[in-house]
Amino acid sequence: AAIAAPASLVVVAAIRPPLGLWPSVTAMTADFHTGTGERLQIAPLPQLKIELDTQSSLRRRSDAQGEGFELVQGQAAIETGAGLRLALFAGPGCVIADEGAVRLDVRNTHGQVRVTCLQGSARIEHPQGRLQLQAGQQTQYDERLSGVVAEAVASEVSAWTEGMLVFRRAPLREVVDEINRYRRGKVLLGESALARAPVSGRFRIDDPDAALEQLRLTMSLDLRRFPGGIAVLG
């Protein structure tokens, strides 16, 4: 006889899918959603263009001064026209763009939010304070607002909008995590010691398996493949 899974386990699997093998209920019920390997361009308001990257979810969310949006998860490239006030919630903070034409790249993954201002200016409102960003600046926050602002390389930050991933001495763990966002199944690192190995390169997001093969060759790694899209690199 078949054994039914406890209801509590089913609920947990729906909210937090094991190995991230399928979207969560929260992501699937958002107003706009992309699956693995998909991208979506939308214009939900006049003078507002948004491009969602793979595994991204966006929903409408009102704020005190009007309509806004929430980046539930994933990454979005945003372009606003002059005269539009945009409130984009991401994690515990909110990105406000209300000072003319603005281009932003906002990423919300693994509990960490990264905001890059590519054109114009924007400010972050967070329970721990406010932070202003100008064109070419980037910051990150989670439950803490560090206030650290760094210079951003626009061509690298927005490379995904042109179908590429660009890394410059990024830890292998970070590269694998990014490949997993574009690939069905799951890539695992076989040795924890490899996690910090630096990686530099350009990879096409529409062929993540070619990226794995490139890593295997350039770093002299083993690559084992298993059913269900599971692969072990190490």
Residue map of PLM features:
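A residue-level detector for the "anchor" residue at the start of short, highly conserved motifs
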Residues: A1-L71, A77-G234
